[in-house]
Amino acid sequence: MNNKILEQLEFNKVKELLLPYLKTEQSQEELLELEPMTEAPKIEKSFNEISDMEQIFVEHHSFGIVSLSSISESLKRLELSADLNIQELLAIKKVLQSSSDMIHFYSDLNNISFQSLDRLFENLEQFPNLQGSFQAINDGGFLEHFASPELERIRRQLTNSERRVRQILQDMLKEKAELLSENLIASRSGRSVLPVKNTYRNRISGVVHDISSSGTTVYIEPRAVVTLNEEITQLRADERHEEGRILHAFSDLLRPHVATIRNNAWILGHLDFVRAKYLFMSDNKATIPKISNDSTLVLINVRHPLLSNPVANDLHFDHDLTAIVITGPNTGGKTIMLKTLGLAQLMGQSGLPVLADKGSKITVFNNIFADIGDEQSIEQSLSTFSSHMTHIVSILNEADRNSLVLFDELGAGTDPQEGASLAMAILEHLRLSHIKTMATTHYPELKAYGIETNFVENASMEFDAETLSPTYRFMQGVPGRSNAFEIASRLGLAPFIVKQAKQMTDSDSDVNRIIEQLEAQTLETRRRLDHIKEVEQENLKFNRAVKKLYNEFSHERDKELEKIYQEAQEIVDMALNESDTILKKLNDKSQLKPHEIIDAKAQIKKLAPQVDLSKNKVLNKAKKIKAARAPRIGDDIIVTSYGQRGTLTSQLKDGRWEAQVGIIKMTLTQDEFSLVRVQEEQKVKNKQINVVKKADSSGPRARLDLRGKRYEEAMQELDHFIDQSLLNNMGQVDIIHGIGTGVIREGVTKYLRRHKHVKHFAYAPQNAGGSGATIVTLG
């Protein structure tokens, strides 16, 4: 397809109409590169994709895709063994997450028979291990502390050191308030300093980092915090080094998968592009045209896409029709009709919806040529006629029977008689070459050519004689006629002058009467057709309204079912919580053994009435909802005991799940994690007691870490931990108390000695913590 036609018809402006619908940079790049195609199967595939997307919107009301940055350059850098920065890794993380979401979305689609999009969905690949590792990068482009143990250690030390510096400086603010110009802690060159009055600079020993512009304030780093600030500076350098190491490791993880990730990114961008095409079609009442294989071109109620309130027109370019000649005066909309045909064909061949009604057809041209407007070349000193003729000669040399040719004011710019003769000769050459042509002209001689010549048809633009203005309605089959006499009469020209003028053109009066009759018949036919279309539109509106009501009803029904299920679940949860509270109180106040409490709990559960709910439609629906939320590979999760995010990577034969949490792999049962919804992620509060379940030959086992706790806090957590361990039938537990001053260790020992359910306890082996940990046997 020649590029000149794209400029002449302003095709790039048409493409810009789709920009507001795009969410990904990849789809924007695809739109920028979009050009008309010349192969029918490729065009058909594009149309099928839009039809598939329409089905998705009908069934699901939406097709969610997040904004994605282009990762093309980042992937190229990976291929060159370069390391990516945090923002580049975050962009790739979003692509991985969006790929996983799209795979899950596709697996949940029902009642849709795809023609093309299924292949795109099925070519998407998941990377659960990578997703799990990349949870260490949050959405703000920050590395979480759990990205590595070393980073966590550095940041913990950094936090402690900064807290100590703040505390020392806060104390000095109180003690040295009279020496300070402001009661605040300032920062200079990354160091925490105090703003000291210049007259008292010798009263506070330390390092001077800055002096105010007025010279009245000196910013001093007190000697008491110099060492700590140096430690903070070193820790920040260590933090940057460790972050760089982690980014290098993440880059290495991505390198083997560059090709697949690039393919995923392209698919996501293309799906976004198809979504944009559908939304453009829906908002502009456009349609997907059929593709004819016999050069037939039918446009029903076609509109110019770049006009604000375009008039819709019908155009029928049958397979045996070679040329349509639009005659009549200027300013009637002839050029707009010419451009509308060209743009509709360009849009259709680019795989875009056409601004026309259903039933429209396009054909596939290898080239579209146009001579529109004044393309006079001042540099070449050519006249308007010469400029047009040079262009027309070029078109005639290049056009073939697989081309569409558009001429605006063919033969204009020279002697009318010679111009008309040239126009007819050019049209005749194109007709004999079987090249489809639409031409506009104001030469009356071409009316006769259109009437007398086979496979050529006249057309004109309607003119309202009452208002003396064009209506821009296209009248195919009706040649244009001059309205000069009617206009002159209405503008007040003397009747005898108008009569004399008519007598002078008596030879053309019969032709004009025939044209007038044809116009009247065309108008009547159009009125009837408009009425039929109005009825059709009413029927369509009714059908849409019924469908919309049905969809709303289905949606509301599903919401009610979900609400009923949630309410029922809340009631059950409330009852179970109350029973747990009662049992806890009993355990605190009695001599009941843990296994007796568990038996009692089971008896309480048995009190619930056994009702056959197999035929209950509401609960059956609820079960389906619950089943639809079963964990799947690639799901994001919250590990309950840690409060940290991870990603499911695989399911074991025994039903347990493997998950990637930062750089750590974990094996979890389903009750040890909760799913994070894609569109409604819930914030999870980190629990203060970290319990890590392990497999042990003596039965379930748990661990409690009391290091860094205050004595009272540690004893409360120990008491709660032992209670929970007994209720969960733990056979053996580990308590990590550290060595330190020995206060917490002694408190743990005293507590265990007096607890009636502790069978035995002893320090851990030397290789498992030694005297810093105690192993407890419960019973």
Swiss-Prot record:
SUPFAM superfamilies: DNA repair protein MutS, domain III, P-loop containing nucleoside triphosphate hydrolases, SMR domain-like. ATP binds at G328, P329, N330, T331, G332, G333, K334, T335. Residues 704-779 form the Smr domain. GO terms for biological process: mismatch repair; negative regulation of DNA recombination; rescue of stalled ribosome. InterPro entries: DNA_mismatch_repair_MutS_C, DNA_mismatch_repair_MutS_core, DNA_mismatch_repair_MutS_sf, MSSS, MutS, MutS2, P-loop_NTPase, Smr_dom. PROSITE patterns: DNA_MISMATCH_REPAIR_2 (PS00486), SMR (PS50828). Keywords: ATP-binding, DNA-binding, Endonuclease, Hydrolase, Nuclease, Nucleotide-binding, RNA-binding, rRNA-binding. Gene3D superfamilies: 3.30.1370.110, P-loop containing nucleotide triphosphate hydrolases. GO terms for molecular function: ATP binding; ATP hydrolysis activity; ATP-dependent DNA damage sensor activity; endonuclease activity; mismatched DNA binding; ribosomal large subunit binding; rRNA binding. The keyword Amino-acid biosynthesis does not apply. SMART domains: MUTSac, MUTSd, SMR. The keyword Nuclease applies. Endonuclease that is involved in the suppression of homologous recombination and thus may have a key role in the control of bacterial genetic diversity. Belongs to the DNA mismatch repair MutS family. MutS2 subfamily. Homodimer. Binds to stalled ribosomes, contacting rRNA. This is Endonuclease MutS2. It comes from Streptococcus pyogenes serotype M49 (strain NZ131).
